[in-house]
Amino acid sequence: MGKFQIISHPLIQHKLSILRRKDTSTKHFRELVNEIAMLMGYEVSRELPLEEVEIETPITKTVQKQLTGKKLAIVPILRAGIGMVDGLLSLVPAAKVGHIGMYRDEETLEPVEYLVKLPEDIDQRQIFVVDPMLATGGSAVLAIDSLKKRGAANIKFVCLVSAPEGLKKLQEAHPDIDIYTAALDEKLNEKGYIVPGLGDAGDRLFGTK
């Protein structure tokens, strides 16, 4: 079973509480999503492999550690996942970025995939799938299905807020996936929104209704 981790760093929790407020502006919401994603990135990337390499400082030669050069890919679930990309890229600027586009059918609440655009070598990369919300879990499951069909195996899912229903669905469908979140909320309401949640992350990021 992959691990499930709530990242409870004080800065993340403080920023998340501001993010949740209904009067937080689009500009501020966008900035906060970016900042929280960056802070979460430190924990999500904790297990990246290191190797020893000899370098020369202004004083002497020395053996130090650096990333092994393992290939990374950040894959946002469109559209809200886009808001988390820059924060993670600030930590791993050489990462490739793929896109999986989905929308939620408002009657069935099920996700519908309309776009998959990925690096050609996606099967060789460590992948961070990002979406601010893990609500019903349908989009996350479908996105990871798409990645696995293309040979991807090393996948982590990163979200800001999650619901127990979505977590259960994702873990049952993909028990090998590590899941990182900043909060596990109470439940979903009858419309499939997380309670207390933060509303529609996509609308709040882009100023739409």
UniProtKB/Swiss-Prot annotation:
Family: Belongs to the UPRTase family.
Reaction catalysed by this enzyme: UMP + diphosphate = 5-phospho-alpha-D-ribose 1-diphosphate + uracil
Molecular function per GO: GTP binding; magnesium ion binding; uracil phosphoribosyltransferase activity
Sequence positions that bind uracil: I194, G199, D200, A201
UniProt pathway annotation: Pyrimidine metabolism; UMP biosynthesis via salvage pathway; UMP from uracil: step 1/1
Enzyme class per UniProt: transferase
Cited InterPro entries: PRibTrfase_dom (IPR000836), PRTase-like (IPR029057), Upp_B (IPR034332), UPRTase/APRTase (IPR050054), Ura_phspho_trans (IPR005765)
Residues engaged in binding 5-phospho-alpha-D-ribose 1-diphosphate: R79, R104, D131, P132, M133, L134, A135, T136, G137, G138, S139, D200
Gene: upp
Co-factor: note: Binds 1 Mg(2+) ion per subunit. The magnesium is bound as Mg-PRPP.
Main function: Catalyzes the conversion of uracil and 5-phospho-alpha-D-ribose 1-diphosphate (PRPP) to UMP and diphosphate.
Activity modulation: Allosterically activated by GTP.
Name under which the protein is recorded: Uracil phosphoribosyltransferase
